[in-house]
Swiss-Prot record:
Topology in the lipid bilayer: Peripheral membrane protein
EC number in record: 7.1.1.-
HAMAP family xref list: NDH1_NuoD
Entry superkingdom: Bacteria
Protein name: NADH-quinone oxidoreductase subunit D
Function comment: NDH-1 shuttles electrons from NADH, via FMN and iron-sulfur (Fe-S) centers, to quinones in the respiratory chain. The immediate electron acceptor for the enzyme in this species is believed to be ubiquinone. Couples the redox reaction to proton translocation (for every two electrons transferred, four hydrogen ions are translocated across the cytoplasmic membrane), and thus conserves the redox energy in a proton gradient.
Gene (UniProt): nuoD
Lineage: Bacteria, Pseudomonadati, Pseudomonadota, Alphaproteobacteria, Hyphomicrobiales
Keywords of this entry: Cell inner membrane, Cell membrane, Membrane, NAD, Quinone, Translocase, Transport, Ubiquinone
Subunit structure: NDH-1 is composed of 14 different subunits. Subunits NuoB, C, D, E, F, and G constitute the peripheral sector of the complex.
Length: 398
């Protein structure tokens, strides 16, 4: 008697929202056929705060802290996109030293993000040592954030027209001294994970994304580079002073989780290269000077000036009560954030507040393909794939 039972149906389980491998407040509804994933249904919006609407009611200066709270793993990279958009509309050029400080801190943010991703990726598949080493380095980087802006995470350090304040020379020297020991830590992580048999079994040929599909789904950043395209906005559409920096773009060939891991490891080394060049340029005579534009309609005057000049005092008062009036127009500015292309589409109507600020978060496009990538994989592979997409919920839900 070998009749098939009639009522075979797939098993549905909840993954998250409080699952340790769910990276924040993700809820996945998984439809399983045995242990094979038949369907993935991501439920988002658990961290939605209406950021885009809130920005419409704030001046351009007050809008900056909202960007720290999107991808809160690498905050300054988001502020960068918003400031670039506003600067395009205002038609202002950031002073050289301001550009170098921005690039330096954006690369620190990239390392912060990749360290977290690579080490938690290892933790998701069962390795417990990498996160301990990685977080030790992240701690040092957060101290650099704190010494520049007073805050470890939500820095609000970038300004329209430059950065809030200059870096002390001691801080620049300390960042330079940090570079060499950090590369040794990356090598240690490399030795621990790259050739590790278990790590490879969990990541090689898992979550393969062919290049054609990566473009179709709107992927960017590591997700397209892992599939073999040398697409990096820092090279293809250089902004600030990236055009004069010498660095390489690592690309993968298989488009699987393992290639994406290798790319993030190599990108950390390239970021250190860029940081070294920034520090060298900051220490050179032409790297000295103002860090924010001298135009008092956009940036506040110096304290000493305000004590002497009534006009400077009025400028300061107007700037912080009313804010800067941005000429009407619309603009799209994108930066190569650690997760991918982070874009800001800004519509100004000539007032002191943005008319509309559309945020293009890279993680959103990556998460929407979760169903497509996971089908046919085992349940245990879901957390490995999710980790390699590098999703942070602040920017997905915004």
């Amino acid at each position: 008697m070998n009749e098939q039972p009639e009522n075979l149906r797939n098993f549905t389980i909840n993954f998250g929202p409080q699952h340790p491998a769910a990276h924040g407040v993700l809820r996945l509804v998984l439809e399983l056929d045995g242990e094979i994933v038949a369907r993935v249904d991501p439920h988002i919006g658990l961290l939605h705060r209406g950021t885009e609407k809130l920005i419409e009611q704030k001046t351009y200066l007050q809008a900056i802290p909202y960007f720290d709270r999107l991808d809160y793993v690498a905050p300054m990279n988001q502020e960068h996109a918003f400031c670039l958009a506003a600067e395009k509309l205002l038609g202002i050029e950031v002073p050289r030293r301001g550009q170098l400080i921005r690039v330096l801190y954006c690369e620190i943010g990239r390392i912060l993000s990749h360290l977290l991703n690579v080490t938690t990726q290892a933790m998701d598949v069962g390795a417990l040592t990498p996160p301990l080493w990685g977080f030790e380095e992240r701690e040092k980087l957060m101290v650099f954030y704190e010494r520049a802006s007073g805050s470890r995470m939500h820095a609000a350090f970038f300004r329209v027209g430059g950065v809030h304040q200059d870096l002390p020379q001691k801080l620049v020297d300390d960042i330079e001294a940090w570079c060499d020991p950090f590369l040794k830590v990356v090598d240690d992580l490399d030795r621990l994970l790259t050739a590790n048999r278990i790590f490879k079994q969990r990541n090689v040929d898992i979550g393969v994304v062919p290049l054609k599909e990566a473009w179709e789904w709107g992927f960017s950043g590591v997700m397209v580079r892992g599939s073999g395209a040398a697409w990096d906005l820092r090279k293809s559409q250089p902004y600030e002073c990236y055009a004069e920096m010498d660095f390489d773009i690592p690309i993968g060939k298989n488009g699987d989780c393992y290639d994406r891991y290798l790319i993030r490891m190599e990108e950390m080394r390239q970021s250190v290269r860029i940081m070294r060049q920034c520090i060298q340029k900051l220490n050179a005579p032409e790297g000295k000077g103002p860090v924010v534009v001298e135009d008092n309609k956009v940036a506040p005057p110096r304290r000493g000036e305000m004590k002497r000049s009534m006009e400077a005092l009025i400028h300061h008062f107007k700037l912080y009560t009313e804010g800067v009036h941005v000429p009407a127009g619309e603009v799209y500015a994108a930066v190569e954030a650690p997760k991918g292309e982070f874009g800001v589409y800004l519509v100004a109507d000539g007032t002191n507040k943005p008319y509309k600020c559309k945020i293009r978060a890279p993680g959103f496009a990556h998460l929407q393909a979760m169903d497509h990538i996971c089908r046919g994989h085992l349940l245990a592979d879901v957390s490995a794939i999710l980790g390699s997409l590098d999703i942070v919920f602040g920017e997905v839900d915004r």
